[in-house]
Amino acid sequence: RIGLILFGKGNIGSRWLELFAREQTTLSARTGFEFILAGVVDSRRSLLNYEGLDASRALAFFNDEAVEQDEESLFLWMRAHPYDDLVVLDVTASEQLADQYLDFASHGFHVISANKLAGASSSSKYRQIHDAFEKTGRHWLYNATVGAGLPVNHTVRDLIDSGDTILALSGIFSGTLSWLFLQFDGTVPFTDLVDQAWQQGLTEPDPRVDLSGKDVMRKLVILAREAGYDIEPDQVRVESLVPAHCEEGSVDHFFENGEALN
């Protein structure tokens, strides 16, 4: 029996719940494992049940039944799980959650991550996390960090494992910026297009992560490391589109004061 805990119930998390609800039976039949959705967690509240949650109704139940839970009590609940293995699904953009990967590894949890922060952290921290999962025999899988779910990371790793040397990687590494510049023709203020993309879930929770180039930088660091290069995030040259007076503060502050983008 494999227990699953989903961290993040935004665009990616809600779509994953739809997919899991549809594929749960097929997945179990194909693999021979019983997959149980044990919890859904956001930044403030948790909905947890060792017996399992109905993925198709988890969000509705979450709104009515989720409770506020501190990090320590949640971790204790996870450590007491009754399953053969516990898998953490991190579909957040949370640095706080990424900082817990070492603890997850040390307590025998697997991690599947769409969160780029751990994979694009400093080299020393990245190696520390990677080694922790290696030593405990747990999996840290992060193919979902680059390429919108396409097996880009796997392809790069397979080439390296086959003895190839990767000299360069090229591509469009930001679906957000690609969409924005495709739409922009001067008739609609650029900030309005950014707002549209944000409302449609095409950006990071904070669109400044896309506009600053940080999102692309993180993807490049992750891919470069998969290709065998020892690289630090600050070695990637980034030119930000975010006006200096909008770099700090809330997302609302950014939208209210982002006229310079136009």
Predicted regions located by residue number:
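Glycine-rich phosphate-binding loop of nucleotide-binding enzymes
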Residues: 91, 112-114
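Rossmann-fold NAD(P)-binding glycine/threonine-rich loop
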Residues: 94-107, 116-143, 148-158
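Conserved active-site and cofactor/substrate-binding residues in soluble primary-metabolism enzymes
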Residues: 7, 11, 15, 35, ...
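N-terminal glycine-/serine-/threonine-rich beta1-alpha1-beta2 phosphate-ribose binding loop
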Residues: 1-107
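Short acidic, glycine/serine/threonine-rich loops at helix termini
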Residues: 16-19, 49-54, 123-126, 151-157, ...
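Rossmann-like NAD(P)H-binding beta-loop-alpha module
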Residues: 134-137, 141-200, 214, 222
